[in-house]
Amino acid sequence: MGVTVVSHPLVQHKLTIMRKKETSTASFRRLLKEISLLLCYEVTRDLELTTMPIETPLMPMDAPVLEGKKLVFASILRAGNGLLEGMLDLVPAARVAHIGLYRDHDTLQPVEYYFKAPEDIVNRLIIVVDPMLATGHSAIAAIDKLKERGATNIRFLCLLAAPEGIKRFTEAHPDVDVFTASIDERLDEKGYIVPGLGDAGDRMYGTK
């Protein structure tokens, strides 16, 4: 297992616009959805296909299709929903889990307030989404919870990651692949990724 940085030019271009402090809430939200489409392509690159019989205008054939119902997108609330929307546009048959966590600004530790997931997650691929992998505490807590429910096939998708968060996360869950658009320099004293883009949830919902 490892860490994949999605360096596609479109991803990097859109990420740069999102980083700019003058980017509006509406533009930030739109760009996050657009990037999620591109990141989803990468994280689902090796999904298994099955075949189904169809008829084209010319003849019958057995055609490849994705078994979308075997896929779960797990959003770490609230910012994860910004990535979730675009991914569901691509895979509308996927199931959805919501994991409510917020970071205590004094201890930087995650506090859980909500968890809802499909009951039959044991045999499904679960892609956990959260724009930021900063300290890593929230991502670790979310995946701890999913594993408690029996999940064994999990991937983590984020927009930005800090080296400290990646180290902590991969030590806690070495079996979970990480996909990100950028690994930034470091965390500051408040646990924010720098240079980063600020608080993704606040910028997405205009609550900063």
From Swiss-Prot:
Binding site for 5-phospho-alpha-D-ribose 1-diphosphate: R78, R103, D130, P131, M132, L133, A134, T135, G136, H137, S138, D199
InterPro entries: PRibTrfase_dom, PRTase-like, Upp_B, UPRTase/APRTase, Ura_phspho_trans
Pfam families to which the protein is assigned, alphabetical: UPRTase
Name of protein: Uracil phosphoribosyltransferase
Coiled coil: none
Mechanisms controlling activity: Allosterically activated by GTP.
EC number: 2.4.2.9
Listed pathway(s): Pyrimidine metabolism; UMP biosynthesis via salvage pathway; UMP from uracil: step 1/1
Listed cofactors: Mg(2+)
Described function: Catalyzes the conversion of uracil and 5-phospho-alpha-D-ribose 1-diphosphate (PRPP) to UMP and diphosphate.
TM ranges: none
UniProt-listed GO biological process terms: UMP salvage; uracil salvage
Cofactor annotation comment: Binds 1 Mg(2+) ion per subunit. The magnesium is bound as Mg-PRPP.
Gene label: upp
Annotated catalysed reactions: UMP + diphosphate = 5-phospho-alpha-D-ribose 1-diphosphate + uracil
Residues given in the record as uracil binding sites: I193, G198, D199, A200
